[in-house]
Amino acid sequence: MWAQKILVALLIGYAIASKVFQEAKVGDRVVLDLGRDVVTWKRVRDNNKEEYIKYCESGETEPRCKGFVTEDGEPATPTSKAHVEKDGKLIFDPFEATDAGLYSSPDQKPIERNEGGAVSAVLNTHIALTVKE
């Protein structure tokens, strides 16, 4: 019984640890960073719709290269002054109140296999970006 309680406590701890809280002032330059493996970012704002943006090499023309878009490729509204840099960082310049939301990346790999065949799993990191008053 005590082992189950410890397991539940650990799972709750891992779930909380996977969410990072970041405040930003309207008008500031804001940088979100989930690591170098990130090309595509996903966000969910108050409207509960998933929106995507990604880093693109020169010559790529898909809608996600130009700014946040909905799953069907339509520009997200209200718009953001945001882009993804080659190193995977999401930059807002400037940050607007409508940019507040939950940010993550579908590029993060929660399950990894090492050379010996062992499997490890971690929860994807989510950044809750809020407006600092």
Task: Say what each PLM segment does.
Residues 2-17:
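Cleavable N-terminal signal peptides of Sec/SRP-targeted secreted and luminal proteins
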Residues 19, 27, 132-133:
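Extracellular/luminal ectodomains of metazoan preproproteins built from arrays
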Residues 32-78:
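N-terminal V-set
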Residues 77-118:
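Ligand-binding face of N-terminal immunoglobulin V-set domains in extracellular IgSF glycoproteins
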Residues 18-21, 92:
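A detector of helix-start/N-cap boundary segments at the beginnings of structured domains
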